[in-house]
Amino acid sequence: MKMKDFKLERYFAQHEFTAKHLLSSSDCDGYGQDYVLDRANPTELKMWNDIKLGYTESAGNPILRESITQFYKTKNIEEVVVGSPGELNYITMRVLLEKQDHVVAVSPAYQSLHEVVHSIGCEISYWKPNENWTFNPSQLEHLVRKNTKLIIINFPHNPTGSYLTLSELNQIVSIAKKNDCYIFSDEMYHKLLAKSEKELPPISDLYSKGISLWGTSKSFGLAGLRTGWLVCNDLDFIHRVICYKDYLSICSSAPSEILSIIALNHIDDFLQPNIKKIQQNINLFAEFAQTQDVISSFIPPKSGSTAFVKLNINCSSLEFSNYLVEKAGIMTIPAEMFDHPGKFIRVGFGRESLPKILPIMRVFLEQNKQILS
């Protein structure tokens, strides 16, 4: 079965580099190469200066994998494989699933978490949130069947900013253990948390069939490195991922691996400015939302860098987004890009430009009240 076009990425391709203002980006502002290298210690700087632009190890640079393990219980680099995040998501589904397997997946979600599963010919059930964007593990349990092979979760959650408690995450692990199925946990926004939230451990720390995906794109503000990694205690699974990777990227970029090592070893210099910026932008948007009738509901995110904002409009969210980018140059991602019913747009809080965008959006909404409401 062929995969459908990636709607969200195609929408970004259409507008991301032509729109004047981006209000829906899920990543944080990208740091410059000099910023990364300025944080390198002498050993790391020597690695950079001595870099060879040949092939790298297919599983990932051993020093990079060792740097990754500082954030996990496992200290065995054989339980870590490096690749681009999208590639690793794709490979995971391909090596784990067969036609007619059953999968339970969080929804709404980044399209690739569902589409690859569909393309294999699996049956998929969706674990959906309540109106306040909370996910109930008891509802998940009712979706699991005897032939369920995989549970797909994503917390911090894109696009809603929802999060779980440790008790809720442990419930999910218990459900998976009871049914002997894998858990694939998209943790790309790991560590981006509101002050009120307690950081969850990676799923690979809690369950031998737990597969954790993280990378430098979101939390670190280093999306251009295209560095991601899987961590799993199941060495056979890791081996199959590496073997499948031989048909795709084969290996990672040597410069990206060294820059990723530096970022991981100096994580607070990347993470803390992003957390501060996200929280400031959330507060600004909350004030803005209170003054706008077109915003029906704004639930501040508990985690991650995005929120799913409900609109009070007489058109679809896609029509709203198209009109907004055409008339005001502001790009937003509508609910249709997540196959989610209702009138919502994703708002991203990881960019310094948000305070400058809101006044422009305010003028647009005031000038188009009759059209929108």
Predicted regions and their residues:
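Conserved glycine-rich beta-strand-loop-beta hairpin in the small C-terminal domain of fold type I
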Residues: I261, K277-A286, S297-L311
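Conserved core segment of the aminotransferase class I/II
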Residues: S208-Q279, E287-F288
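PLP-dependent enzyme catalytic core of the Aspartate aminotransferase-like
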Residues: T74, V104, N314, Y323-T332, ...
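Active-site phosphate-binding strand-loop segment of PLP-dependent enzymes
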Residues: E131-K198, L372
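Conserved beta-loop-alpha segment that forms the PLP phosphate-binding cup at the N-terminus of a helix
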Residues: N61-P62, N76-Q100, R226
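Helix C-cap/helix->beta junction micro-motif
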Residues: I120, N147, K178-N179, Q292, ...
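PLP-dependent aminotransferase-like
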Residues: V95-I153, S174
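N-terminal small-domain helix-loop-helix segment of the aminotransferase-like
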Residues: M1-S84, N368-S373
